[in-house]
């Protein structure tokens, strides 16, 4: 499970715990670790213009896909070394900034990452980014699920429509689904944008994806 831009917080730990109750070992890494230990932000991180938001953005804007793929390799090695975790296929899912990371992982490690999901992922079509998901769909062997909010300035419908066309042309296995009437962040229970029906659908689709592909 890959974090969104505001970083590691209790809300994400709760979501990881919920997934664990379905029978999965869940890793929730701090992807900002390269910036040092002081990368857990206060509630003000969600307020544009706040000092915490600016501090987070100074780290977030330096994030790119290739280093995160190196982190995924380390996580796969860690999973293999833990006796209590079954070896074999793994799933990766991400929210917001980590949506493209999850999809890129399925392309970079196609024999290991057999299921990947993006929820309101940003920059899924980015011609300037190495390993942008829209370029690597054809390398994926597993199943992908991409869930987009109908109202999302960070992932507008123009991008989603282009993504759908490229996804279909790639022949990749999976689905792109638009959640009607909801906004970016709909799955986060502690945020103003939370939408319970869409959030519960997110859990249903994620867990069913993993059950199909991780057994």
Model-derived features: positions:
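N-terminal cap/leader regions of alpha/beta-hydrolase-fold enzymes
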Residues: 1-215
